[in-house]
Amino acid sequence: MANYECATRTNCFRVKDPEAFRKFMSRVYGGCKLEVWEEKDAAGNIQFGFGCYDGISGYEPESPETADDDCDYGYDEFLEVLQQHIAEDDAVIILECGHEKLRYITASAIIVTSKDIESLDVCDIAASRAAVLLNNPSWCTKCDY
């Protein structure tokens, strides 16, 4: 049996409160160590990015007093809290690419703004585009096998 292996990385983005964001990201976990980067853009604003050689699983409670037994927050909750940190006029694009040997090869993008969360899958996008190029709206294919 093969293991799923992936890498995850974001674009550069701005947040409302850099210190609060750093604190939140210190509680985010995945299959390996999450790296968080920051740099200043041309206007001097702090931009962040993050990534890891695995997927993001969720985040840990802020303190033991606020946690139930075995309490941690999953990926959906991670996205909801991330959404609260993003600057109003910016977006986080979380890119993940992975594989399980050659059986599954996946690539996705999750776009998170302060108001919306949308998920894109490269197989779906490619199949839709192929149908357009073939001028056959009902064309479909199997990408995972």
Which residue stretches match the model-derived regions?
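Short, extreme N-terminal segment that most often corresponds to the first beta-strand
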Residues: M1-V28, D144-Y145
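A contiguous, surface-oriented mixed alpha/beta subdomain in the mid-to-C-terminal portion of proteins
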Residues: A2, C32-W37
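Charged interaction segments
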Residues: V28, E39-Y145
